[in-house]
Amino acid sequence: MAENGAARGGTSAGGDSSTPFVELGRADWAELAQSARLPLQEAEIVQLRGLGDPLDMREVGEVYLPLSRLLNLYVGGTRQLHRVTSDFLGERAQATPFVIGVAGSVAVGKSTIARLLRELLSRWDDTPRVELVTTDGFLLPNAELERRGLMRRKGFPESYDRRALLRFVTAVKSGAREVRAPFYSHLSYDIVPGAEIVVRQPDVLIVEGLTVLQPAGGGTRLAVSDLFDFSVYVDARTRDIAHWYQERFLTLQRGAFANPKSYFHRYASLTEEEARARAAAIWADINEPNLTQNIRPTRSRAKLVLRKDADHTVSSVLLRKI
């Protein structure tokens, strides 16, 4: 992929000079990669879309191509820092993966963005090996959640094996030849016994999940976010995310839930009115409290924030200055 020109100036978020972020409107952000060639075809973009996410060539070119270029610059800068540090210490430089965290609410589109970044970053000559792991694989098995009385808290921080996730990212970041992670099935809504995802020394590792930016729970413990070289938070208004969640639920109810093996097969026979009511209840009881209490408070910890409008398009980008 070709390089683009230098970045143009932005404004402090909200016009507040005390904010750690600089905010760029969509048009200004899009100019930052105007000379870069979009390496994906329309058919590839369609394959990357999530349910209800109208991702298209224009959105990729104006929003995510500049982001991939910025990440490419960060990768190069981080590698250079590792080299000079190794020289200073008189040690042999060891290649370590660049780790990116992608966070945001359920239904906000973070999975689509993570998949898209994987494809875009793998097209840069210096980062051909890009791996994507979601934190779903580090959820406690349903049987354990039931034992602890946490099934209705699935997706909340306490429902994850955070130590296992931290060990996994630490091993990858340390350059381990092969690291394994549990596999999660959205059909069975559970960890699949014996199934694994294998990560083998990638150039870039993307970790996507609801609460990946959460700090450690007090004391001096290490959090997985401490291992990120870059982090992205996908932001939108609560009412828009609630609407996207409901529409996604209806799409699944008419499709995937019809599979008798689906954990949610019991919802397949609901009328549209009943399905909407059920989706609204799940949102109000589980997803919105998790967003309010655990997910959105981590937004300020991100290196970059993507702000979405009601149609899923990104309207502005906030980049941390310090």
Swiss-Prot record:
Its EC number is 2.7.1.33. It holds the Pfam family PRK. Transmembrane segments: none annotated. It catalyses: (R)-pantothenate + ATP = (R)-4'-phosphopantothenate + ADP + H(+). One of its GO terms (biological process) is coenzyme A biosynthetic process. It is found in: Cytoplasm. The keyword Nucleotide-binding applies. One of its GO terms (cellular component) is cytoplasm. The keyword Nucleotide-binding applies. GO terms for molecular function: ATP binding; pantothenate kinase activity. It is an enzyme of class 2 (transferase). Belongs to the prokaryotic pantothenate kinase family. HAMAP family: Pantothen_kinase_1. NCBIfam families: panK_bact. This is Pantothenate kinase. It comes from Leifsonia xyli subsp. xyli (strain CTCB07). The gene is coaA.
